[in-house]
Amino acid sequence: MTASTWTTGGQVRYEKYSLAGNTFLIVDETRTPLPDDATRSSFARWILDPYFGVGGADNVLYLSHAPGGGALTFRIFEQDGSETLSCGNGLLSAGHYAARFLPEVREPSGEARAWTFLTEIPSGRPRQVRVGEGFDKGCMWVNVGAPRAFPETLYRRDTDLSGRVPPTASDGPAEQQNLLEAELAVDRPPQNFLLDGGPARGEAWPDRFTGHLVFNGEPHLVLVGAHGSPALGQDLFAPAPTQNSIDLMEFLGARINLRHKETFPEGVHVNFVDLTGRTPRYRTWERAINQETLACGTGALACAHVLLARRLVPDGPVTMRPHRANWHRPGTHLRVTPGPDGLVLDGRPAHICTGTVPSRQDLPPRQDLPPRQDLPPRQDLPPRQDLPPRQDLPPRQETPQ
C-alpha cells in the first residue's frame, strides 16, 4: 500500500500486541507509509479512543525504514496524540513483529535474528537500541544500554522537589551510574482512599518520599519500600484488585506530577517497588498516558537498576513482577539482566490480532441534515361555537320499596 492509497481512502492495517498487560497497535510504515506527523497524531488519537475508535491499547507504534537502511525507526504515540521517547515492552513487541514480517531488515552487524531500532525520535538525537530473539521460543530481548543523565528538558535540577530539601546526587558508585537521589513532598490522600488501614486508622502519612531518578530512554522516579507507612505498602500491593488500591496509585502518580510540574515539565513515570516477597514487585504510573498501566518495560529496567545499584538484590538477573498485571494473570514477570554494555530486558510478546481500519481523515464526511422545511402557516380553526345552556334534569324519582 502506498502513500497515495492512504490519502485517497486507503485502509491502514495494524497488528495488536500484548506483553505483561501492556498493549500496542503496530502500524508498519514500510508497507503503509503515512504522509506526515499530523496524520500520525490524529490517527493515534482516533484509533486509541475507546468510545469512538478501536481502543483497547496503550499506544500506537509506527515502524519505518531508518535513513541509510539496515535499521528501523521506532516511534510511539500516546492516546492524546503526542509522541513520547521510548518504550521497553513496545520495543520487544516491535522486535517480535520484525521477526515475523520483516526478516530482511537486520542490524548493520548482520547478527542473525537481531534488529536495530532508532528510538527517542522527539529528542532530535535518535538513539540506537538492539532487539533480538532469545533462545526460548517466543522470547525477545532489548538492550537499552546503561542509564544516562537526565536531559535538561525533562528535569530541572535547580528546582526544589520537597520545598525544603533539594535533590542531591548520590555519592560513590551510584553517581557514576547516573542514579540521582531526591526527596520530594507528597500530598496526603483523602481519608476514604485507603483500605481499613493507613491514615484512616490514625497512622501517620509521610510528608516526603525519598526516591531515585533514572533516565533510560524515559524519565522514571523509583520509590522503594513503604516510606514509614506500612499500610501504604499493604494498600498499594494488595493481594487482589480493589478500587481503593487502584485509586490510591492513580492519586499518587497524578499528584506527584502535578505538585512537581516545574521540576518535571514533561512529566515523570512514578514507580513503587515492594521487596517483602521473594520477587520484587512494582507498579508504574505513566506520564503522557496519565494513568497506571498493567506493566512498564522501562519501569522494570529503572526499578531493577536502583535495586542493583543499592545492593537491595543479589547481583545478576532480576525478575520483576508487575503487580497490577499479576492481579489478572499470576506469574507475569519481566527479567532484567545487567551486562557490560547496559541492562537487557526480556519478555514474551503475544500477537493478539490483525485489523484494518480507515484513517480518521478517511471516514465519510458527516452528512448534514437537510434544511428544515417550515410547516405551512397555521390555519386558525373557526370560532368556537358555544354549546346551548345545560338543561337541568327533572328531580330524581325515588323507587318505591
Describe each model-derived feature in a short phrase.
Residues 170-238:
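Internal active-site segments that recognize and position negatively charged phosphoryl groups
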Residues 142, 149-167, 171-177, 184, ...:
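C-terminal domain-closing interface element
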Residues 2-137, 147, 204-205, 214, ...:
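A glycine-rich beta-to-alpha transition motif near the start of alpha/beta enzyme domains, typified by
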Residues 363-399:
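Long, intrinsically disordered low-complexity tandem-repeat segments
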Residues 44, 142, 153, 182-184, ...:
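Generic low-polarity alpha-helical segments
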Residues 143, 151-180, 196, 235-261:
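Aspartyl protease catalytic domain
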Residues 166, 200-201, 228, 375, ...:
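Polar low-complexity intrinsically disordered regions enriched in Ser/Thr and small residues
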